[in-house]
Amino acid sequence: MLPARHRLRRSSDFAAVLRGARGAGGSRSGSRFIVVHVNPTDARAGQPPRVGLVVSKAVGNAVVRNRAKRVLRALMSSRISQLPDGVDVVIRAKTDLPGTPTAILAHDLDKLLATVLRRAGSQEGH
């Protein structure tokens, strides 16, 4: 479980990350199973990173969606300390996610996080 201070809760926060990932400063990258959106903001400098999950009904029924959220939450809770302060991350599950071994998801998540954080960091200077 992610601590409350590390969770995105408001829909406006989710929208800002998803919008920001397409614009200046933000970044997104995806695999067959997940898409990771990152939006570092100066307004949140010095505050802990926050994470949000988006798992739509296209992924499966409620049982499947909740399991997907539990797995993604557990993977992110062990990686939250690696994220820089002031960064908001949204992980969007794709329809191929159910049934994917956790080890593969962990590998994809690590690779995608490294990619989007590197891109977001290089765009901040511009």
Regions found by a protein language model. Give the residues of each.
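Contiguous, often N-terminal, cationic amphipathic patches that form binding interfaces
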Residues: 1-64, 74-77, 81-85, 94-126
